[in-house]
Amino acid sequence: MERTFIAIKPDGVQRGLVGSIIQRLESRGYQLVGLKLVQVSQELAEAHYAEHRERPFFPGLVKFITSGPVVAMVWQGKGVIAAARKLIGKTNPLDAEPGTIRGDFGIDIGRNLVHGSDGPETAQREIALWFQESELVNWTPATQSWIYE
């Protein structure tokens, strides 16, 4: 089963949107297999955003993600990576469609509420960076037969 990493950033936590964001993924039929509240260290932030290290906005990314608690999650299900990206919406909330998390709740590109892995390799890397295998729970929801053939 495909897995993805989703993080509710400090602005989403501070604004009380954790439940609303989780509910959108649950309502879609995806399964939560890992969840924790994290005060992100400088080291974790720099590792997470490593591909942006040489970009001018890198220091701002690191400063923001370490500015408050983050809800780190692992979700699984058929096509979860692409579906989660659609649910999240475009990076700039002003360009995001209504009905997406960023389109409904976001205003500023620098405070865009949530991060989602952009592909299978990224998901694997991010899950391994944020979670130990022992923190992920394998379980079968009672509704699974109503979601998948």
From Swiss-Prot:
Where, by residue number, does ATP bind? 9, 57, 85, 91, 102, 112
Instruction: State its Enzyme Commission number(s).
Output: 2.7.4.6
GO molecular function per UniProt = ATP binding; metal ion binding; nucleoside diphosphate kinase activity
Catalytic activity, as annotated: dZDP + ATP = dZTP + ADP; a 2'-deoxyribonucleoside 5'-diphosphate + ATP = a 2'-deoxyribonucleoside 5'-triphosphate + ADP; a ribonucleoside 5'-diphosphate + ATP = a ribonucleoside 5'-triphosphate + ADP
Output the PROSITE patterns linked to this UniProt entry. Answer: NDPK, NDPK_LIKE
Which compartments does it reside in?
Cytoplasm
* Top-level enzyme category: transferase
Cofactors required: Mg(2+)
Q: Which GO terms describe its cellular component?
A: cytoplasm
Pfam families found in the cross-reference section: NDK
UniProt keywords, alphabetically: ATP-binding, Cytoplasm, Kinase, Magnesium, Metal-binding, Nucleotide metabolism, Nucleotide-binding, Phosphoprotein, Transferase
Q: Sorted alphabetically, which InterPro entries does this protein's record hold?
A: NDK-like_dom, NDK-like_dom_sf, Nucleoside_diP_kinase, Nucleoside_diP_kinase_AS
Q: Relate the assembly described in the record.
A: Homotetramer.
Function (record text):
Major role in the synthesis of nucleoside triphosphates other than ATP. The ATP gamma phosphate is transferred to the NDP beta phosphate via a ping-pong mechanism, using a phosphorylated active-site intermediate. (Microbial infection) Catalyzes the phosphorylation of dZDP to dZTP, when the bacterium is infected by a phage that produces the substrate for the synthesis of dZTP (2- amino-2'-deoxyadenosine 5'-triphosphate), which is then used by the phage as a DNA polymerase substrate.
NCBIfam families with a match to the protein in the record: PRK00668.1
By sequence similarity, the record places it as follows: Belongs to the NDK family.
**What protein name applies here?**
Nucleoside diphosphate kinase
